Amino acid sequence: MDIQAEKIEKLRKALDNFERAHARGESDFFDHEKEEKKANVRRRALLLLNQRARSVNELSTRLKALEFEEDIINEVIGDLTRSKLLDDEVFATEWVRQRAARRGKSSRALDRELQEKGVDKQTRAAALEQIDQADERDTARAVAVKKARSETKIPQDRADYDKALRRVVGALARRGFPAGMSMDLAREALDARIEDLKN
């Protein structure tokens, strides 16, 4: 018998042994119980991702809170990452794009949010590059103007003016804009609103 025929015979015997073991439920080729656990974790992970995009850390934390086994969670996270259903770079880029445009958030506030979601520093920095400083200033100005429009009376004295100014500056501060820029834009927006009320 030549070498190739010998290899074929060994493979045939190994396949026969595997089929007999599998028929008796003794095969370790496919761990049915483990795959069942993975399917449950994967199902829950996909439900969470269907609600909204999430970072790797955020999804992992949520799955751990549901008391799934950590090694199964890690395998599912790995599968989702390899299939590009879970990607911190895409998540961070979309998070910044949407929150800057729709919520009027500063780059500093967005950086803090991404950090809380477990996105690493390099990925956060790359995502935040899409925010232009001029655009950020325009966003801050729009927030200041919107908040200043809520003033319905002309301040009667300096104390009233300062109170109104604090409200506008507070709106900017909550969105993470720098104090100096916030004060300038708040004063500009409040003064313009007072002029509108006078006319």
UniProtKB/Swiss-Prot annotation:
Location, primary (coarse class): cytoplasm
Pfam family, one: RecX_HTH2
One cellular component (GO) term of this entry: cytoplasm
InterPro entries xrefs: RecX_HTH_1st, RecX_HTH_2nd, Regulatory_RecX, WH-like_DNA-bd_sf
Keyword Cytoplasm found: yes
Keywords, ordered alphabetically: Cytoplasm
GO BP annotations listed: regulation of DNA repair
Intracellular or extracellular location(s): Cytoplasm
Free-text function comment from the UniProt entry: Modulates RecA activity.
Family to which the UniProt record says this protein belongs: Belongs to the RecX family.
Name used for this protein in its record: Regulatory protein RecX
Organismal lineage: Bacteria, Bacillati, Actinomycetota, Actinomycetes, Mycobacteriales
Gene: recX
